[in-house]
C-alpha cells in the first residue's frame, strides 16, 4: 500500500535506464522527489500485460535524475515508461485489521483473504522514540524454555539475538517462542520474514492456524500479523520488509499502548539485501564485501525497537552466522544492539540436545542479582561453572579416560552430563517430528531442578532420565520407568 496523493500534486517522470532492480528516472527541473519517496509505475509491457511496480528513491544523480530501487521484479519495464512520485514514503496498514493476515513489503495482503479492512496506514520510515520517552526499568520476560530462562533471560522490551549457522534450529526456536508467548502471555506478535525460505513462511502460517495463534474463522481473534519478503524477491523488498513489520509493531505500542513481540527471521538477510542494494547503487564495498553504511543501516532499524512509557516492543531476531564465524561484520554489528544473545551450537545439535543453545556462549544483561535475585543468579553461575569444568576435562577424558580423573572431577562430569541433558526440552511446535508433547517450564521449577542436580540429590538417577523432559518430577518418573524396564 503506497501513499497516493491527489492528482494535482503528482509529479510525473520518465524511466531513462533499467539495470536489474535499479531504475533511473528523469523528472522536470525543480520537481525532483525526496530521498525515500515511493515512485509508482503503472503501465503495460510490450506483451500487453499490466505492470504495477513501486520503487524507492535512493540517490539524486544530477541532470534532473533520481536512482530508485524496485520493490518487485522489473521484468517488462522499458525506457520511456511514466513514473509517478507519490510524494511520501512507502506506507503499510496498521492496527487490529492486520492481525491474522500476511503482507508483502508494500503492505499488500498476499494471503488471498481479500482487502484489509482499515484506512489506518503509517510510513515505514520514521524517527526512533525520543530519549525522554524511553522506559528504563528492567523486567524479566519468561519464555518457558529452561536454558533461556535460567542462563540468558530475556528482557521485556529488550532485543534478543538468536545466533547460529544453517540448520541448527533458529526458526524452530522462534516458532516455539511465538507459540509460548501467545498461549501464556496472550500478547500480540508481529513476524517479519526477511529473506528466508518461502516454504518456512508457509509452514509457519499453517502452524499458527493449527495452534490457534491465527484464528482462521475469525481473524479479529488472531494474535499475530505476518510480513514477508522472501529469498526469491528483489533486494529492495528484502531490505525494507523488516521496516514494514516494525511499523505495524510500533502502532500496537504507541497507539494501542500494548506490549508487542517483534520476530525477525533473519536479520542477516536484511544486511545481505542492504549489501546487494549498496553494490547496485555503485558504492565502494567495505570489510568482507559489506556495504560501507552497515552500522547505520542496522542502527536505524534497531533504535526503533524499544520500550517507551506507553508500551514495549520485545524483539527476537534470528541471526544467521556465515560459516559459523561470530566475528563476521554482520553478526558482530548486530551484537552491539542486543540485551541478550542466544547462541545455537552445531556441536550440541550433533549430540541431539535440542534446543541446541550453548550455555557458555549465550549471554544476557539481565543475569545479575539485582534483577533476577540471588538464588537464580547463583544457580545459573554454578551450572555454567560445572559445564565449564566439564569442557576443560574433556581433553583429559579423551586421552586418558574417565578412570584417571579424581573422585571430585568424576562427580563434576556426571553432574555436568545430567545438566547438559536437562537443558534439552521437547517443543510444542516440534511435536509432529518428535512424537513427544511439548513442555512449558516455569522459572521456579527450572531453578529448583538445577539446584537439585547441583546439590547431589539426583546423583543416583540414570543420565538418560534427564533427556528431553520438562521439570524434575518428569525426570523422576522417567527414571522409574527406565529402572523398571531393566
UniProtKB/Swiss-Prot annotation:
GO MF entry, a single one: ATP binding
SUPFAM superfamilies listed in its UniProt record: C-terminal domain of alpha and beta subunits of F1 ATP synthase (SSF47917), N-terminal domain of alpha and beta subunits of F1 ATP synthase (SSF50615), P-loop containing nucleoside triphosphate hydrolases (SSF52540)
Pfam family, one: ATP-synt_ab_N
Protein localization: Cellular thylakoid membrane
Cellular component aspect of the GO annotation: plasma membrane-derived thylakoid membrane; proton-transporting ATP synthase complex
PROSITE patterns: ATPASE_ALPHA_BETA
Residue stretches in coiled coil: none
Binding residues for ATP: 164-171
Source organism, top-level taxon: Bacteria
Catalytic activity: ATP + H2O + 4 H(+)(in) = ADP + phosphate + 5 H(+)(out)
EC number of the protein: 7.1.2.2
CDD domains, A to Z: ATP-synt_F1_beta_C, ATP-synt_F1_beta_N, F1-ATPase_beta_CD
Keywords, comma-separated and alphabetical: ATP synthesis, ATP-binding, CF(1), Hydrogen ion transport, Ion transport, Membrane, Nucleotide-binding, Thylakoid, Translocase, Transport
PANTHER family associated with the record: ATP SYNTHASE, ATP SYNTHASE SUBUNIT BETA, MITOCHONDRIAL
Role summary: Produces ATP from ADP in the presence of a proton gradient across the membrane. The catalytic sites are hosted primarily by the beta subunits.
Family indicated by similarity: Belongs to the ATPase alpha/beta chains family.
NCBIfam families per record: atpD (TIGR01039)
Subunit structure: F-type ATPases have 2 components, CF(1) - the catalytic core - and CF(0) - the membrane proton channel. CF(1) has five subunits: alpha(3), beta(3), gamma(1), delta(1), epsilon(1). CF(0) has four main subunits: a(1), b(1), b'(1) and c(9-12).
Listed name of the protein: ATP synthase subunit beta
Organism annotation: Prochlorococcus marinus (strain MIT 9215)
Gene: atpD
Amino acid at each position: 500500500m503506497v501513499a497516493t496523493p491527489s492528482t494535482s500534486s503528482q509529479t510525473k517522470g520518465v524511466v531513462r535506464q533499467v539495470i536489474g532492480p535499479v531504475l533511473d528516472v528523469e523528472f522536470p527541473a525543480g520537481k525532483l522527489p525526496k530521498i525515500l519517496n515511493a515512485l509508482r509505475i503503472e503501465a503495460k509491457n510490450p506483451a500487453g500485460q499490466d505492470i504495477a511496480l513501486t520503487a524507492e528513491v535512493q540517490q539524486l544523480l544530477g541532470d534532473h535524475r533520481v536512482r530508485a530501487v524496485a520493490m518487485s521484479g522489473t521484468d517488462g519495464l522499458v525506457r520511456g515508461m511514466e513514473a509517478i512520485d507519490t510524494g511520501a514514503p512507502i506506507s503499510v496498514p496498521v492496527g487490529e485489521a492486520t492481525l491474522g493476515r500476511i503482507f508483502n513489503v508494500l503492505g499488500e495482503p498476499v494471503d488471498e483473504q481479500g482487502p484489509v479492512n482499515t484506512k489506518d496506514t503509517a510510513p515505514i520510515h520514521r524517527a526512533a522514540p525520543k530519549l525522554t520517552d524511553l522506559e528504563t526499568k528492567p523486567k524479566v520476560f519468561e519464555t518457558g524454555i529452561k536454558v533461556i530462562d535460567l542462563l540468558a533471560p530475556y528482557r521485556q522490551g529488550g532485543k534478543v539475538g538468536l545466533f547460529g549457522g544453517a540448520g541448527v534450529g533458529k526458526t524452530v526456536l522462534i516458532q516455539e517462542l511465538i507459540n509460548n508467548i501467545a498461549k501464556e502471555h496472550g500478547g500480540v506478535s508481529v513476524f517479519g520474514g526477511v529473506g528466508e525460505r518461502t516454504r518456512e513462511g508457509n509452514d509457519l502460517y499453517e502452524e499458527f492456524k493449527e495452534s490457534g495463534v491465527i484464528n482462521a474463522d475469525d481473524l479479529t481473534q488472531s494474535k499475530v500479523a505476518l510480513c514477508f519478503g522472501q529469498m526469491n524477491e528483489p533486494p529492495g523488498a528484502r531490505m525494507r520488509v523488516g521496516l514494514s513489520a516494525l511499523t505495524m509493531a510500533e502502532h500496537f505500542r504507541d497507539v494501542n499502548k500494548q506490549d508487542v513481540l517483534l520476530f525477525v527471521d533473519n536479520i542477516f538477510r536484511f544486511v545481505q539485501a542492504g549489501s546487494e542494494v549498496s553494490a547496485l547503487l555503485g558504492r565502494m564495498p567495505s570489510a568482507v564485501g559489506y556495504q560501507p553504511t552497515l552500522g547505520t543501516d542496522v542502527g536505524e532499524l534497531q533504535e526503533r525497537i524499544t520500550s517507551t512509557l506507553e508500551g514495549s516492543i520485545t524483539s527476537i531476531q534470528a541471526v544467521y552466522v556465515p560459516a559459523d564465524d561470530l566475528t563476521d561484520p554482520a553478526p558482530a554489528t548486530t551484537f552491539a544492539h542486543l540485551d541478550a544473545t542466544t547462541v545455537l551450537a552445531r556441536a550440541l545439535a550433533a549430540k541431539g540436545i535440542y534446543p541446541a543453545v550453548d550455555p557458555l556462549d549465550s549471554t544476557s544483561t539481565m543475569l545479575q542479582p539485582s534483577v533476577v535475585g540471588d538464588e537464580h543468579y547463583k544457580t545459573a553461575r554454578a551450572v555454567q561453572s560445572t559445564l565449564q569444568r566439564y569442557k576443560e576435562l574433556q581433553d583429559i577424558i579423551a586421552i586418558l579416560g574417565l578412570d584417571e580423573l579424581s573422585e571430585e572431577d568424576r562427580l563434576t562430569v556426571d553432574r555436568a552430563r545430567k545438566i547438559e541433558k536437562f537443558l534439552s526440552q521437547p517443543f510444542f511446535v516440534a511435536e509432529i517430528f518428535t512424537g513427544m508433547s511439548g513442555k512449558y517450564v516455569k522459572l521456579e521449577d527450572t531453578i529448583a531442578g538445577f539446584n537439585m542436580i547441583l546439590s547431589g540429590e539426583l546423583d543416583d538417577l540414570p543420565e538418560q532420565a534427564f533427556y528431553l523432559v520438562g521439570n524434575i518430577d518428569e525426570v523422576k518418573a522417567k527414571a522409574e520407568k527406565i529402572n523398571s524396564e531393566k
